[in-house]
Design a protein with these regions (language model features):
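Transmembrane alpha-helical segments and their boundary/interface "anchor" motifs
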Residues: 1-22, 46-48, 100, 129-132, ...
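Short juxtamembrane and helix-loop transition motifs at transmembrane-helix boundaries
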Residues: 2-9, 24-34, 84-91, 111-122, ...
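Membrane-interface helix-boundary motifs at transmembrane edges
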Residues: 5-8, 55-66, 113-126, 146-151, ...
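Aromatic-anchored segments of alpha-helical transmembrane domains
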Residues: 25-27, 71-84, 132-145, 197
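Interfacial loop-to-helix transition and helix-capping segments at the boundaries
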Residues: 30-44, 83-107, 139-164, 191
Length: 252
């Protein structure tokens, strides 16, 4: 709505409607939508939700889950290397496509299936598991293989994010398990849904007119957007929505 009010046009109206339906993830070129709305990521998430029964079927047992993960990874590689060619119109295929990000969802499912074993290993081998995750994280940035192409980026990110999930599942480290993270977790959905609106508000201030350094501009923007999103989410959840739900419950 903010985008439509700021830049009113028939194109903005069409794109706003596509965003509201939450089905825009099925559009082959929805990554070019200029009305940011809830963002491309939520488009992928809702495609995943619609396919969730099939995902549960694939994750029914460990053998099927591993086969599904391998097949999805191979299909993603083929999509990035073959179906993006001139033969198929040279249409860009990236993380806006559910087939490309399917390995991420399935790797998360695999981590869930092995959560007991993961917790046992990480808790008993805290130092070793911490070192392994740290080494993988450092290698990702020190040896940026992902710069070689989309396939390399896909494979390295799947490995990196999977290692983070594995360590997070089993750790009781105060860095991740504390009052701050629990508080942010309680309003994480509200933060996600509102952060682009806050970004639009920050964008209107035109900080770039006053801050010329790109790195500093990025840091300031992140702080303002995250701080604004947290404040907005807190007010909405613990004050406004709380009053609305209490009013509705009084009518029962």
């Amino acid at each position: 709505m903010v985008d439509l009010l700021v830049s009113p046009s028939i194109s903005s109206l069409y794109e706003l409607f596509a965003n509201i339906t939450l089905c825009f993830g099925f559009l082959p070129n929805y990554g070019s939508i200029t009305v940011i709305g809830v963002g491309w990521f939520l488009g992928i998430i809702f495609v995943f939700y619609m396919l969730y029964p099939f995902f549960v079927f694939l994750m029914d047992n460990k053998k099927r889950a591993w086969i599904s993960f391998c097949v999805s990874t191979l299909l993603a590689i083929i999509a990035l290397t073959y179906f993006e060619s001139d033969k198929y119109g040279n249409v860009p295929i990236d993380r806006h496509n559910i087939l490309v990000v399917a390995p991420f969802f399935l790797s998360g499912g695999l981590c869930y299936l092995y959560k007991e074993s993961i917790t046992k290993f990480v808790c008993s081998q805290k130092v070793i598991s911490g070192i392994i995750v740290s080494v993988i994280s450092l290698m990702f940035f020190v040896f940026p293989l992902y710069k070689d192409g989309k396939v390399e980026l896909l494979l390295t990110e799947v490995g990196l994010f999977s290692s983070w999930i594995v360590w997070t599942i089993g750790t009781t480290n105060k860095l991740l398990v504390n009052k701050v993270t629990k508080y942010l977790s309680s309003i994480s959905m509200e933060i996600y849904l509102s952060h682009m609106m806050i970004y639009r508000a920050v964008e209107m201030v035109h900080i770039e007119r006053y801050v010329k350094n790109g790195n500093m501009l990025y840091i300031i923007t992140v702080i303002l957007v995250m701080g604004g999103a947290i404040c907005f989410a807190h007010i909405m959840k613990f004050y406004i929505l709380k009053k609305i739900t209490s009013k509705l419950s009084s009518f029962k």
